[in-house]
Amino acid sequence: MTNEFLHFDRISRERWQQLHRKTTPPLTEEELNSIKSFNDEISLQDVMDIYLPLTNLIQIYKRAKEDLAFSKGIFLQKTLKKQPFIIGVSGSVAVGKSTTSRLLQILLSRTFENAKVELVTTDGFLYPNSVLQEHDLLNRKGFPESYNMELLLNFLDHLKNGQNYQVPVYSHEIYDIVPDQTQTIQVADFVIVEGINVFQNPQNERLYITDFFDFSIYVDAEVENIEKWYLDRFGKLLDLARRDSKNYYHRFTKEPVEDIMKMARNIWKSINLVNLKDYIEPTRNRAELILHKAHNHEIDEIYLKK
């Protein structure tokens, strides 16, 4: 164990799954398949072993937050405004953040009766391609400078104050922000914020994004596994794009597969791997919980901050 994990408790999958009583999964196999990323692997057994104990843990943190707010209100002699419980989910591209986030959205909405759970990805806070091109940043897309961090902080501030907010919508099909389209994030009991940059500190800002989170999760894996998953996903995106001329990846389908996959490997090494090592992975220890995935996508270890 490196020094980075000294303030974490390492918990094996076998030990973790014992922290929740055996029960029926609160979703079906069909529902699970519908929410998983198309290059990801997850089973109902994973839901039972990993995510139901995690939901219990989140319940403990939520109760502690409410107790603190109640006590603080007594001390200040006023009623404090109810705030959503905000969960940050981070990790590399292609590691399975989206699957984790969508699954948590379902589990929380069914664990807490009548709970409203919103999910937003930070892809919507990328600058549009036109802005990135204007500032010669298109090849830095996904790096910290390609995000409108001021807008992201403003969004989180509105969330904390119990206010609705309209966020831009990003499309992987067109590889850009969708013009004139927004997603309204309404006042909710839980808000899950998912993205590679959610633990990063905005430049020249006194506020840290993690200051807004009540709980935070980093989805982790060995670099060689993430690279394989990234290339698998790229290949599947190409297959989908062959049938859709409007898809951003359609332009690549006319080239030999070997050439395109060579390009994908170069993109991984020159962009995604650099971003992971320089900006994403260094934020890992800011998470409250780390879910480590093995080569088969199965979570084999959990690290919980002491």
From Swiss-Prot:
E.C. no: 2.7.1.33
Catalyzed reactions: (R)-pantothenate + ATP = (R)-4'-phosphopantothenate + ADP + H(+)
Pathway: Cofactor biosynthesis; coenzyme A biosynthesis; CoA from (R)-pantothenate: step 1/5
The keyword Amino-acid biosynthesis is assigned to this record: no
Primary residence: cytoplasm
Positions bound to ATP: 91-98
Leader peptide range in chain numbering: none
The keyword Kinase is annotated on this UniProt entry: yes
GO cellular component, one term: cytoplasm
Annotated Gene3D superfamilies: P-loop containing nucleotide triphosphate hydrolases (3.40.50.300)
Protein's GO biological process: coenzyme A biosynthetic process
Gene Ontology molecular function terms on file: ATP binding; pantothenate kinase activity
Keywords of this entry: ATP-binding, Coenzyme A biosynthesis, Cytoplasm, Kinase, Nucleotide-binding, Transferase
Subcellular location as annotated: Cytoplasm
Protein family (similarity comment): Belongs to the prokaryotic pantothenate kinase family.
PANTHER family per the UniProt record, alphabetical: URIDINE KINASE (PTHR10285)
Name of this chain's protein: Pantothenate kinase
Organism, scientific name: Streptococcus gordonii (strain Challis / ATCC 35105 / BCRC 15272 / CH1 / DL1 / V288)
Higher taxonomy: Bacteria, Bacillati, Bacillota, Bacilli, Lactobacillales
Gene behind this protein: coaA
